[in-house]
């Protein structure tokens, strides 16, 4: 009888640990989701300080233009005039997938966004800094349906060639 009670007790404790583990993982995803929503909201409301406080001081932002590859301070300088107008940019999340590293210090995600440019895709990395999730890296891309790629590449061919030449000159 004692053996049966011990087995039931052990199974109960094991189940509790498994449930706690999945709840804490879900909780980290919810935290990251909340941070990303707050970041997009800060941009829509032109809240410059809130927006940049969600990023690490050594973060990196890559925009839709091939020349938009900014460190934190350069991105702040680029963004400031947009925020000063009263609304920087308004991105509404359509869907988001979040991944949490086992030690819960890093997270990465991808998202589809409804933007003034149409559907865009965002992706990035967050890390825990003093117990808070901060965006360390973000990439914004315009989503182009495959059937429009040929006309798009034709449209930007000259610009791309000039930019490639500029990037490869030594």
Regions found by a protein language model. Give the residues of each.
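A mature extracytoplasmic/lumenal domain signature
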Residues: 55, 65, 95, 111-115, ...
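A short, structured loop/turn motif at beta-sheet edges
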Residues: 99-105, 126-134
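Low-complexity, intrinsically disordered terminal/linker segments enriched in charged
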Residues: 129, 137-170
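Short, well-ordered alpha-helical segments enriched in acidic and aromatic residues
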Residues: 45-58, 62
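Short, aromatic-enriched amphipathic alpha-helices that serve as compact interaction elements
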Residues: 28-47, 160-163
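A short gly/proline-enriched turn/hairpin at secondary-structure junctions
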Residues: 59-70, 82-88
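Bacterial Sec-dependent N-terminal signal peptides
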Residues: 1-26
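Surface-exposed, charged secondary-structure patches
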Residues: 74-119, 168-170
């Amino acid at each position: 009888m004692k053996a049966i009670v011990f087995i039931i007790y052990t199974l109960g404790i094991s189940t509790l640990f498994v449930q706690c583990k999945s709840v804490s993982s879900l909780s980290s995803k919810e935290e990251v989701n909340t941070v990303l929503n707050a970041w997009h909201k800060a941009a829509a409301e032109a809240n410059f300080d809130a927006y940049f406080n969600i990023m690490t001081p050594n973060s990196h932002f890559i925009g839709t233009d091939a020349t938009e590859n900014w460190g934190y301070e350069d991105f702040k300088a680029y963004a400031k005039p947009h925020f000063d107008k009263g609304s920087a940019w308004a991105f509404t999340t359509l869907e988001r997938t979040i991944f949490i590293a086992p030690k819960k210090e890093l997270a990465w995600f991808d998202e589809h966004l409804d933007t003034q440019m149409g559907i865009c895709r965002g992706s990035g990395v967050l890390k825990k800094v003093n117990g808070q999730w901060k965006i360390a890296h973000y990439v914004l891309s315009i989503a182009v349906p495959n059937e429009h790629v040929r006309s798009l590449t034709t449209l930007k061919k000259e610009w791309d060639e000039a930019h490639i030449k500029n990037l490869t000159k030594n």
